[in-house]
Amino acid sequence: MRIRLTLRNKMFLFFSVIMPFGFFFLYAGVFAKGDPAAVRFLLGPVISLAVMGSFWGLSAALVTFREQGILRRFHVTPVTSGDMLASSIVANYVLTLPTVALELLFARVIFGVHGFGDLASVLIMVTVGVVSFASMGLVVASVTNTMQETQVLNQLIWLPLIFLSGATVPLADLPKVAQAFGVFLPATYLVWGLQDAIYFSAPIWHLWKEALSLLGWAILTFFVAAQLFRWEPESKIPRNAKLWAAATALPFLLLGIWENQAGTILLQSKAAYQSLQHRDRTTQPSNVPDPPANK
């Protein structure tokens, strides 16, 4: 039933289906010019957009369900708030996987991409990514009262996520100030984790920082969302309770400070981007370069 309700949500369909495919063909056909190696390089950012779409789609869906009284119907059943939120995440995950699979299929059939790196790492990064960004969407839905408020807050969060993380513009191409800010964003770790897994075939133990940071953040945001969850549109949460939502920024605030000192992701993303540019200059066949140094 949760899957059927999710499919009725236009926001979810746009951000988790239509937008990812639009970016896929834009990146693969225009930016990569159909070159298989370049398409493979861009698959990480493209798939990350599909994964992050669960944030916008789920927050909008939950607020809509609350305004329309659908959550009230669930409330009279033995379903707990944790059950409701968990089922929402599972529904988004089940519906996001076909989008990711189709993007990989199109890359193979249309653009001739051979091999997609370490698929186990890709699946794990997609899984923790969907759970973490969907949980953030649940937090937004819990602290906003109307769809208008939800859309405003989503925009404020969404724009930095897609423009400063490497999802739409390579991190190596961003100004240094934007790069320094980007490492505070969870999307940056999702984008690089997927790109490292697909382009460099990185096993999951080489992506421990990206995977564990997203997993820890998912647990925290889900817990906060469960504490703030409301079944009724008339229910309000105290203003001081919203500080729980602000606490969800703490993990990546600390990780961003550390990363700005270490510079690991910035160096690796620059090396990856330069390797693709070097390949273009030498006009060699679509061989995948050796991975950068292990973390």
Regions found by a protein language model. Give the residues of each.
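Transmembrane helix-boundary elements of multi-pass transport/secretion proteins
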Residues: 2-71, 82, 88-96, 100, ...
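Alpha-helical transmembrane segments of multipass membrane proteins
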Residues: 2, 25, 104-109, 127, ...
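Small-residue-enriched core segments of transmembrane alpha-helices in multipass membrane transport
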Residues: 43-46, 51, 122-135, 155-163, ...
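Short hydrophobic, aromatic-rich alpha-helical segments embedded in or entering the lipid bilayer
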Residues: 1, 169-211
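Hydrophobic alpha-helical transmembrane segments of integral membrane proteins
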Residues: 13-17, 156-157, 163-166, 182-183, ...
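Hydrophobic alpha-helical transmembrane segments of polytopic membrane proteins
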Residues: 121-144, 165, 216-225
